[in-house]
Amino acid sequence: DFYELFLDDAVEAAKLLDITLTTRGQMDGVPIKMAGVPFHAAEQYLARLVKIGKSVAVCEQVGEVGASKGPVERKVVRIVTPGTLTDAAFLEDKETNRIAAVNADKKHVAIAWASLQSGEFKTKLTTADKLADELARLQAAEILLPEGKSLPDGFQATSANITRLNSWQFAADAGAKLLTEYFGCQDLHGFGLDLSLIDI
């Protein structure tokens, strides 16, 4: 069994992973480019892609072969990004893999970070002039930013990968709702979080 990539994804993966690029079938008379990795070795290839800053969506077959005409139904079952890699086999010894998010309003800059390995998550309000130092201390593998926002000039994101998301994904009320639903609680005071602040 293989995990397969097609079209531009196949071309890029073949180059990055040094795997064979081939073709399967045609689309509008043009051969469809394809590359693949063995199922048993997929995690190693996945880790290599993530370590160089790529995000990977893993799809699995969910339909029965031959149950209907056309391709077998597939669904995304896992998304792995630089900040969400948790397998200890692919992390350096004692390395804590963190994902961080940065947002700002007129008064504060908020940082939220988490380690999916340990389940730890924290937030902090700081100022623009201290943000670069805070991010350097965290050594996050991935930093989430709202579209149109940038990190301070003094911060060199050499070890972190920047992922830009829609601004609405940084709304404090939406963050509070997600967290209270996830933890099954009325509010987040027990976690030291104030719903009125942007660090949620």
Predicted regions and their residues:
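Basic, polar low-complexity surface loops/patches
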Residues: 1-198
